[in-house]
């Protein structure tokens, strides 16, 4: 039986007494790549943040690597160190004076460490390897604030790959990228998932890219409306259930 890296059971999140996410249950097997899709306001980002313990949930349970998320979002440090989260907007970018190499090094440091430190040769070697794996070696001495959107996304993946991790959560990672940069990002993400053994949960509006790259799809509109492989979950009939009548499905393209 496949190992379940993430298990969500009957999760409900309320804001001001209103259910934003209601009774959601699913599980992610090790090394799977699952997309979370749905219309604007469906609760996708809220669900992701509740799973990570950033937002509180009112009922249900989340288990990461077999360990339950505490009532205040607590996870053992050994589990937290195996998670990585790429938010929709990277607000640190424009005010962060760190070089790319120093920023990626923060991904190596123990959770909770507040200041960058250069540490051991092992850490420096891990940073160099992460930059090579993500094609960022030539950016090592650049400031984060000097990077383009596509470069920043690659550096964020270097941050994730600098130490072994099991679960990577992305919230609209393609936001702000043109079609070429988005395709390059997803190609790199696909390669890293296979080489690093990541399990991925990604919020996405790019249904065509989801169809091409993901193993499974969760369709959310406050509650989980359908789930399954892309050919099932992204069929016109299922998309109408999630997005409403009159929704125009994406057009199929082939590489």
What is the predicted function of each stretch?
Residues 60-79:
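Conserved ABC transporter NBD signature motif
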Residues 168-172:
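Catalytic Walker B motif of ABC-type/P-loop ATPase nucleotide-binding domains
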Residues 217-230:
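H-loop (His-switch) and adjacent beta-strand-loop-beta switch element
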């Amino acid at each position: 039986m496949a190992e379940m890296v993430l298990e969500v059971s009957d999760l409900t999140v309320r804001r001001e007494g209103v259910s934003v996410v209601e009774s959601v249950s699913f599980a992610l097997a090790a090394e799977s790549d699952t997309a979370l899709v749905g219309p604007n306001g469906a609760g996708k980002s809220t669900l992701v943040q509740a799973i990570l313990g950033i937002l509180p949930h009112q009922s249900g349970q989340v288990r990461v690597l077999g360990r339950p998320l505490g009532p205040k979002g607590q996870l053992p440090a050994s589990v937290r160190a195996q998670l990585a989260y790429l938010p929709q907007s990277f607000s640190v970018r424009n005010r962060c004076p760190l070089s790319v190499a120093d920023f990626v090094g923060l991904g190596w440091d123990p959770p909770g460490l507040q200041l960058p430190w250069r540490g051991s040769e092992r850490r420096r070697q891990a940073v160099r390897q992460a930059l090579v794996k993500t094609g960022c070696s030539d950016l090592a001495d650049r400031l984060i604030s000097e990077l383009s959107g596509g470069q920043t996304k690659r550096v964020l993946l270097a941050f994730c790959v600098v130490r072994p991790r099991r679960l990577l959560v992305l919230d609209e990672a393609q936001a702000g990228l043109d079609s070429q940069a988005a395709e390059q990002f997803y190609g790199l993400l696909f390669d890293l998932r296979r080489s690093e053994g990541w399990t991925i949960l990604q919020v996405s509006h790019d249904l065509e890219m989801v169809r091409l790259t993901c193993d499974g799809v969760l369709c959310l509109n406050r509650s989980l409306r359908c789930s399954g492989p892309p050919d099932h979950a992204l069929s016109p009939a299922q998309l109408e259930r999630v997005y409403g009548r009159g929704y125009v499905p994406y057009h199929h393209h082939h590489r």
